[in-house]
Amino acid sequence: MLIYLLLTAAVMLSCVFLNKVSSKLGIPALLAFIVLGMFFGSDGIVKIHFDNYAFAEQICSVALLFIMFYGGFGTNWKQARPTAVKAVLLSSLGVMMTSGLVGLFCHFALGIDWLESFLIGSVIGSTDAASVFSILRSKRLNLKYNTASLLELESGSNDPFSYMLTVILLSAMKGTASGTAIVYMIFAQLTYGILFGAGIAFVSIKLMRKIKISAGFDAVFVTAVAVLSYAVPSVLGGNGYLSTYIVGIALGNADIKNKKTLVPFFDGLTGFMQMLLFFLLGLLSFPSQLPKVALPALAIALFLTFAARPLAVFTLLAPFRSKISQKLIVSWAGLRGAASIVFAVMATMNTASDRDIFHITFCIVLFSILLQGSLLPFLSKKLNMIDEQEDVMKTFSDYSSEVPVQFIQFTVPEEHPWCNSLVKDVILPPDTLLVMLQRADEKLVPKGETLLLQNDTLLLSAKSPGKIEGVQLSEKKITRDSELNGKMISQLPQKESALIILIIRENEVIIPNGNTLLEAGDMLVINHAD
């Protein structure tokens, strides 16, 4: 018993260490967890013999349900709503198109029989939420055209459709699926998944608002809700993953008590589940078997990455007239990961196939995470898809947008009293704090002994004001014929109830004073008090 505990602790600590190292090296952490599992596995150095697919499927299903739930819980619906139609098309029809194209390729190019070809396509049909979320967050990829929200919503919602196709094909391969049975299976998967997801979410939110739950037990309650939302529809033949994702979105975007305390809890729980899942899948693999399936797996991976996925994306996004650069990034960001391997374990458990579907899928996932995951930030920059004005963290509902803090940027001119002064000697405005200093290309955290120099850009923090009644803003454009053109603000007629607070001049924002000269084309932002 103690040996197992020591081994478990060693694995967990190794995962934490690898997560830190991989982020510095730019390698996806999930890949490191898989490699660690292979290191401990039957063909690895530690040589822990593990080939219990049934046990692995159960553990991985539990891990995946929490990953799916938190994927929904972390989705900021306000940010994601404009992309919802695109995301739903990609997560439903996109999965079917991708799976169908891969199935055709496997049959005609690799000579695999029809049902098994489409089973492989179904298993790898969905993109991986854990991988996509991890890269978007860790690399802070602020993508243009709301692409981060699109990828987040698509990758979080397409696993249920891949799961549904996998279940249908496994039933067909067993000979237990007639035409009527398949129609009912599709109906049950979608209907029960949606209805139970919506119903459980509605009841849970009502209970959390009305019942006072003791501190700490709210996390227990939400954990139970997540498990319940998966188990109930699954027992009745519905899609548990779809139900879980719906409940996650509903709870994550609802106004419930202690929501901020739930975020770190589920962050930790989901992180642990990802470690467990990818480590277990690495442990279950036999690296010595990989060379036997390397060529067909590589062929499928290349076709999936450069043909099937792009064709599905370009076809489905064509009616929306999306930018080519956005389509290319969405195509490239179709990473395969945990869900694909979990479904491959399920397929291995339920078929007597001559093909090693598990290791074929395993190779495809390694290829996807290593190549696509590593190059996604690079391609985003090359395709000019990085939006410097946005923060990708806003697409997640745990982004702390409610923190009442605003930032003020200020460049130190030569004649300013702060120039050549120590921070400790500078008199800041009341209730403000100097939090950052940029000097050329260097960013510094200022201390009391830090010397402020000319052209230093300072960032000050201040409390956001509460709602102030009776204040309204208006805009006024200065034209060439305007009587204000060419005048300084001090020369304008003074109005007690109005103040020019901002001037927008082309791409420049100016905080005015009495000596500011107004020019044609200036947009004045004026504050009026009732």
Predicted regions and their residues:
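Transmembrane helical cores of multi-pass secondary ion antiporters/exchangers
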Residues: 1-389, 402
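Cytosolic regulatory regions of ion transport systems
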Residues: 311, 318-329, 339-530
